[in-house]
From Swiss-Prot:
Its cofactor is Zn(2+). Pathway: Cofactor biosynthesis; riboflavin biosynthesis; 5-amino-6-(D-ribitylamino)uracil from GTP: step 1/4. Belongs to the GTP cyclohydrolase II family. GO terms for biological process: riboflavin biosynthetic process. Binds 1 zinc ion per subunit. GO terms for molecular function: GTP binding; GTP cyclohydrolase II activity; zinc ion binding. Gene3D superfamilies: GTP cyclohydrolase II (3.40.50.10990). InterPro entries: GTP_cyclohydro_II, RibA, RibA-like_sf. It comes from Vibrio vulnificus (strain CMCP6). This is GTP cyclohydrolase-2. The active site is at residues 128, 130. CDD domains: GTP_cyclohydro2. GO terms for cellular component: cytosol. Zn(2+) binds at residues 57, 68, 70.
Length: 198
């Protein structure tokens, strides 16, 4: 059974001015070092906390890549939760689970005209290899059974529900369209059935 390993205060956001806590876990399904970032002690102060499962994206989260909207979604969520409280489950699932180097290979194929899903398939991967079991385990370790989920992705909604987490409300993120990511976002809508207006 998963449990909280450590819980430490820190400040986050573009200006490091938003109070939060970072939590590590033990007993998760794999040895991936997933973390939770909690704002305003939402795990104890909110009966049904706002939760976002955010899969690691080095290129978007750290380098603000033009190819995706991951960094903007993360920043939007941090700012929202900094004001109203909530929990980010930061999952080490780079490239929808294919890993960083394979994602870079997929970028090369996208530059040649494939969309994000076609590129993954061409490399021998399914559309999305992520498994959200550990996100459910993290919520269980925090004693959370009901959430308001911040997502545009129906797979996240479906899988968390299958793992016994009751999703009381779905809160969509904004569409963060910029030069270089419009075809990526359109593929997420047409192929991945994401709830986005692009």
């Amino acid at each position: 059974m998963a449990e909280v390993r450590a819980r430490v205060d820190f400040k986050v956001g573009a200006k490091s001015n938003i109070d939060a806590e970072i939590l590590s876990f033990r007993g998760l399904k794999t040895d991936k070092e997933h973390v939770a970032v909690i704002f305003k002690s939402a795990d104890v102060t909110q009966e049904v906390p706002l939760v976002r499962m955010h899969s690691e994206c080095l290129t978007g989260d750290v380098f603000h890549s033009s190819r995706c909207d991951c960094g903007e979604q993360l920043e939007e969520t941090i700012n929202r939760m900094g004001e109203s409280g909530g929990i980010i489950l930061y999952l080490r699932q780079e490239g929808r689970g294919i890993g960083l180097y394979n994602k870079i290979d997929a970028y090369r194929l996208q530059s040649e005209g494939m969309n994000t899903y076609e590129a993954n398939n061409h490399l021998g991967f399914d559309d999305d290899l992520r498994d959200f079991t550990e996100a459910a385990q993290m919520l269980e370790a925090l004693g959370i059974k009901q959430i308001r989920l911040v997502t545009n992705n129906p797979k996240k909604i479906r899988e968390l529900s299958e793992y016994g987490i009751e999703i009381v409300e779905v809160v969509n993120t904004s569409a963060h369209i910029k030069e270089g990511n419009e075809s990526y976002l359109k593929a997420k809508v047409s192929h991945g059935k994401h709830h986005l207006k692009v």
